[in-house]
Amino acid sequence: MKDSIKQKLENLVERYDEVGALLGDPDIIADQKKFRDLGKEYSELEPVVICYQEYRTVIENIAEAKMLMNDGDADMREMAQEELKTAEAQLEPLETQLQKLLLPKDPNDEKNVFLEIRAGTGGDEAAIFSGDLFRMYSRYAERAGWRIEIISENAGEHGGYKELITRVVGQGVYSQLKFESGAHRVQRVPETESQGRIHTSACTVAIMPEADESEEVELNKGDLRIDTFRASGAGGQHVNKTDSAIRITHIPTGIVVECQDERSQHKNRAKAMSLLAARINSAQAEQFAAEQASERKSLVGSGDRSERIRTYNYPQGRVTDHRINLTLYKLDEIMEGSLDEVIQPLVNEHQADQLAALAN
């Protein structure tokens, strides 16, 4: 292990002990926010410190075994040889685990997200595929125990959606869905195609972490134009009687958001403001990521929604993720929400990128 990484680990052990002492300080205990923040830091440091303590123990065992191998007694040397073999086998997995624990944490990983799906090229077929993608993500969310709320929808003429915006609520949502942003391409024979020709259509998916109250974007009221209108779609007679739907335009950026999910104008406004904050944050993050990507080409995680990331080929039953050259002949299962086999390799690739950067 590099000396620079060892030094970083020693510093983290010191900080862990320091935070542990602070958590017993009556002044800290009296300050709820400070106590909560330190408690969070302590729990984040703990797995790193425990792993590093195991690593140090193994290093000591190796040194001790090597010393015993110089012993004159043959039985002692044989025992030391076995101990050395065992300890060295433990060392590499611990080093790998420590490096992964040292990887920079994405502060958005535990956040809820706004999931946007928009039909692109392909007309009606693209809108139908938007509906298929929404069903895929909904099934995946069900398996993960997440909740999906529809913020706004624009239905396609022959099924699916021209545009759909949802909020996905649950544990670790962003960490699992963040690599889904981009263009999703479908190749299949549309139901309306009499000649049996394969058509290619596309949809774009955007995954935006929901902003915390503490990091909510500062929005100047003078920069906002707020319009009310009557909600369309389900909701019974009530929908037609009140202008409960909200449209907010952020004039400096031209970003427009709508919410017509709730019957209450106040609730729709709150959701629309939250979506607007996420959109502005996401636009800023995309700009930063583009600047970073120009310096270091990363296969995964650019989050550019115009980038073609995946193809769903129905005649072949194939799903291909172009970023990591992953091909799976499990289209039916994936469209039913079995996304882990696609998502986990992307997470692994991202971690490999980070480990390479850490080693440098």
UniProtKB/Swiss-Prot annotation:
A cellular component annotation (GO) from this entry: cytoplasm
PROSITE patterns hit by this protein: RF_PROK_I (PS00745)
Domain of life from the UniProt record: Bacteria
Residues recorded as bearing N5-methylglutamine in the entry: Q237
Compartments reported by the entry: Cytoplasm
Signal peptide stretch: none
InterPro entries, alphabetized: PCRF, Pep_chain_release_fac_I, Pep_chain_release_fac_I_sf, Prokaryotic/Mito_RF, RF-1
GO MF annotations in UniProt: translation release factor activity, codon specific
UniProt function note: Peptide chain release factor 1 directs the termination of translation in response to the peptide chain termination codons UAG and UAA.
UniProt name for this protein: Peptide chain release factor 1
Organism: Teredinibacter turnerae (strain ATCC 39867 / T7901)
